[in-house]
């Protein structure tokens, strides 16, 4: 399994069990599902065995987003102005990270991130925002939106702000 970690905060953001897809060579999109969990349950992306199916209804059951729940992502809020201020600082941090670690990616990141940021701004009202578990204000803010069907949630992670760790 590969864990996708934020290069700034080192928070776990996702894993390959959720089949991230690269979009525009600048972000990962991860389709999510709404699941029901009882207090204390953790979903790591594996399919439960049919033999382990639980019967009955528990009053402590909540409906949650599987990726948000599994990686303990924390909901946060932005207005457009504060998000753009955050994004400018975050992009600078990622550019510095790339300059030190992957200098060949800096140009691709700058072009792709600028174009994708315009898409975000154009559809700003459609997004919910999530930080990693540590809630590091300098770390990645993942974006949650819904597919055209209006019911399938998906998360967006900045590709260049992710490092892959095999476990």
Curated annotation (Swiss-Prot):
Any one GO molecular function term: calcium ion binding
Domain TCTP: 1-167
GO cellular component terms, A-Z: cytoplasm; microtubule
Residue intervals passing through the bilayer: none
Subcellular location: Cytoplasm, Cytoskeleton
Pfam families per record: TCTP
PROSITE patterns: TCTP_1 (PS01002), TCTP_2 (PS01003), TCTP_3 (PS51797)
Keywords: Cytoplasm, Cytoskeleton, Microtubule, Protein biosynthesis
InterPro entries referenced in this protein's UniProt entry, alphabetically: Mss4-like_sf, Mss4/transl-control_tumour, TCTP, Translation_control_tumour_CS, Translational_control_tumour_p
Keyword hit for Cytoplasm: yes
Biological process (GO), any one: translation
Family to which this protein belongs: Belongs to the TCTP family.
Function (record text): Involved in protein synthesis. Involved in microtubule stabilization.
Name of the molecule in the record: Translationally-controlled tumor protein homolog
Source species: Yarrowia lipolytica (strain CLIB 122 / E 150) (Yeast)
Record lineage: Eukaryota, Fungi, Dikarya, Ascomycota, Saccharomycotina
